[in-house]
Structure formats: structure tokens, C-alpha cells
């Protein structure tokens, strides 16, 4: 039994000590390593291209745009309609370089009253713009009771055009 174990150990040791057969190379998968195609393939393997997020491009805008917000007589509270909100949001993003807010009236009250109405309307728009995320440093307010009439008509339809706040958006 001992001899049998010794023979088995000798055979297994002899089998382990023989070198493995060399691999056979056919050469059909060879590519030149220095060719431009091979270098490009290697570059793509090392740095695979990741999908990049598309940058949001805003349409080209004119350097200056003016929006008029009209108010009923003696009303100073700004309650924008959904159409006004959509229009203003479209114009406000990306945030413009500067915004001029100018409150105007129809000259229906004595000058001190009209001045106060124009000022409060301009402040209402100013506060709304700040609540929408426009930095206060980019907004300038002005108001005038008797200036820049859109209509010189003394009747009510013409006066409606004068009761407004002009929002001038400057991009440059």
C-alpha cells in the first residue's frame, strides 16, 4: 500500500512540473496599435463618452422690451391675470440686467393724489417682481402723475391707456 501511495505521489508531482503548452496565435485579430483608428478606439475605451445634458438656450431677445400693466381707476393693488403672469415670466427669465418700473396715472385727481397713486402702483409691481425672484438691485422705480400719455383723449376709453405701469426690461 505504501508503494502505491508513493507511486501516485510521484506521478502527480511529475505531472505538475511539466510546462503548459504555449498558446497558438492565429494573427487574425491583430490591429496596428499606432494607427489613427486604433488610437481613437483606445481613447473611447479609456474615456467613454457620457451623455451630456442639453443646455437650455433662450431665444434671442431684443435688448429692450416694455410691458404695460393697466389698472382700473384709483386701484393700486396688482392682481395679475394668468396671461399677464405667463407674459412676465417669459420676459423675466433669464433674469434681465435691469428693470425700470414707471408708474403713471391719467391725471384725474389733483397732483398730490395722482402722485401717490402712481407711486403705490409702481411699488406693487416692484414687490411682485421681487417675489418672483428678481434681485432688488436690478430694479429701478419711478412715478409721475402727468407724463408720457399713451392717449390724450379726455374721455374714459383714452384715460384707461394712461392708468398704467410701464415695465421696461433691459438685457444689455
From Swiss-Prot:
Print the keywords alphabetically.
Answer: Cell outer membrane, Lipoprotein, Membrane, Palmitate, Signal, Virulence
Stated membrane topology is:
Lipid-anchor
Signal sequence, renumbered to the chain? 1-15
Which InterPro entries does this chain map to?
OmpA-like, OmpA-like_sf
| Gene Ontology cellular-component terms listed | cell outer membrane
The OmpA-like domain is annotated at 58-172
**Protein name per its UniProtKB record:** Type IV secretion system putative outer membrane lipoprotein BMEII0036
Amino acid at each position: 500500500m505504501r508503494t502505491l501511495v508513493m507511486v501516485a505521489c510521484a506521478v502527480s508531482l511529475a505531472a505538475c512540473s511539466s510546462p503548459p503548452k504555449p498558446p497558438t496565435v492565429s494573427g487574425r485579430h491583430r490591429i496596428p496599435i499606432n494607427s489613427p483608428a486604433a488610437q481613437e478606439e483606445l481613447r473611447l475605451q479609456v474615456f467613454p463618452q457620457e451623455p451630456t445634458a442639453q443646455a437650455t438656450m433662450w431665444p434671442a431677445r431684443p435688448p429692450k422690451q416694455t410691458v404695460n400693466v393697466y389698472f382700473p381707476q384709483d386701484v393700486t393693488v396688482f392682481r395679475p391675470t394668468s396671461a399677464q403672469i405667463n407674459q412676465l415670466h417669459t420676459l423675466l427669465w433669464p433674469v434681465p440686467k435691469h428693470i425700470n418700473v414707471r408708474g403713471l396715472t391719467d391725471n384725474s385727481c389733483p397732483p398730490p393724489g395722482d402722485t401717490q397713486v402712481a407711486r403705490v402702483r409702481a411699488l406693487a409691481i416692484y414687490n411682485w417682481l421681487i417675489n418672483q425672484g428678481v434681485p432688488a438691485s436690478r430694479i429701478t422705480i419711478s412715478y409721475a402723475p402727468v407724463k408720457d400719455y399713451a392717449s390724450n383723449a379726455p374721455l374714459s376709453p383714452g384715460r384707461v391707456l394712461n392708468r398704467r405701469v410701464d415695465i421696461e426690461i433691459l438685457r444689455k
